């Protein structure tokens, strides 16, 4: 049994009312990292009252305090039932009740506005609502008008202070003019490494083995995840962009899109010739390739591969770094650049925990 969570279990048995109660949805890579953080001193003011994966859930305090909670869920958890999870939140009588969504589930994200309207706070790494259809974004804003709070730092840059900085600038009367950057840790690593000496497909397989890409790397190569992040930032900056208004140039040719995963991995060397040609053309002009997201003042948004000169900030990235260059009314001579690790379960979980603690 974990020490801090054991204290929570004992407090629950005594009927002590916590300051902040949490239900965690998603106990995968990011959710599992958050569970570890909940067993640190930083989380002593919080109480986990429910946890669920896609099929099973647990609300028993003693079970929630087990170090092997993720395994316990599969073996001893009750069938998934959102109503009973919310009932556990209500029964806690905590002043602050928080639903943490550590999944990538679109159906779950579609519930965020409803939960906010019912008086819960939502903290999320799930981009499907804020970075999805414009109607979902508008429903979210309407729900927030009721007083609920939405912790979304983990949706962009794995918690880099992008959204918080943008909101602070807007509060001070500043306005975003243009945005440019590398928003994907996996694509950052791939093009930071790609110098033409190795086939791109070799690097792609290596990135997958290192855990930098999704199990199906086409999820990264499609550019759709980058587009969702761009939409989230743009909408927070005041641009009413629909998901169909982002021009996305993915890296997966149509012939490889519908293949099963094993066949795609066997044939991903079909990516090599096109990318080698683009690399050679860029190198001849003294440039490198980077997978960029761009937004201009007119609201034109584009995601895709671009050539940048060696003096460009994106040409000097390292590893899986993300980079966000914001040109604003006041930061108009040089952009405000936010850069750092933009992927990883630990930093993403820390962003979730930070948003939860900010509610207390």
Which role does the model predict for each range below?
Residues 106-117, 127-153, 160-166:
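Rossmann-fold NAD(P)-binding glycine/threonine-rich loop
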Residues 95, 146-150, 174:
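A short helix-to-beta-strand connector/capping loop
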Residues 98-101, 122-125, 150-153, 178-181, ...:
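General beta-strand structural signal in soluble alpha/beta enzymes
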Residues 2-24, 28, 34-37, 44-50, ...:
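NAD(P)-dependent dehydrogenase/reductase Rossmann-like domain
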């Amino acid at each position: 049994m974990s020490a801090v969570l054991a204290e929570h279990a004992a407090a629950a048995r005594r009927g002590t009312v916590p300051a902040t109660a949490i239900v965690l949805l998603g106990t995968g890579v990011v959710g599992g990292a958050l569970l570890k953080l909940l067993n640190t001193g930083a989380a002593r003011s919080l109480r986990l009252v429910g946890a669920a994966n896609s099929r099973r859930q647990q609300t028993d305090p003693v079970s929630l305090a087990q170090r092997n909670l993720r395994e316990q869920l599969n073996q001893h958890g009750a069938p998934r039932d959102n109503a009973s999870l919310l009932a556990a939140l209500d029964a806690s009588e905590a002043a602050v009740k928080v639903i943490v969504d550590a999944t990538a589930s679109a159906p779950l994200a579609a519930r965020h506005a409803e939960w906010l309207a019912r008086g819960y706070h939502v903290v999320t790494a799930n981009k499907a609502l804020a970075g999805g259809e414009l109607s979902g974004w508008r429903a979210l804003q309407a729900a927030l008008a009721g007083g609920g709070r939405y912790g979304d730092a983990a949706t962009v840059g794995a918690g880099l202070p992008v959204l918080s900085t943008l909101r602070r600038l807007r509060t001070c009367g500043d306005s975003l003019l243009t945005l440019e950057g590398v928003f994907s840790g996996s694509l950052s690593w791939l093009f930071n490494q790609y110098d033409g000496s190795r086939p791109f497909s070799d690097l792609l397989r290596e990135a997958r083995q290192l855990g930098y890409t999704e199990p199906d790397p086409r999820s990264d190569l499609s550019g759709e995840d980058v587009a969702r992040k761009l939409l989230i930032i743009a909408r927070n900056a005041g641009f009413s962009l629909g998901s169909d208004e982002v021009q996305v140039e993915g890296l997966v040719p149509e012939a490889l899109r519908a293949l099963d995963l094993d066949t795609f991995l066997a044939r991903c060397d079909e990516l090599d010739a096109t990318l080698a040609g683009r690399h050679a053309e860029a190198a001849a002009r003294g440039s490198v390739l980077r997978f960029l997201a761009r937004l201009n003042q007119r609201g034109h948004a584009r995601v895709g591969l671009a050539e940048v000169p060696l003096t460009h900030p994106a040409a000097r990235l390292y590893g899986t770094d993300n980079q966000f260059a914001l040109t604003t009314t006041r930061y108009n001579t040089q952009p405000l650049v936010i850069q750092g690790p933009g992927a990883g379960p630990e930093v993403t979980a820390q962003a979730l925990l930070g948003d939860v603690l900010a509610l207390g």
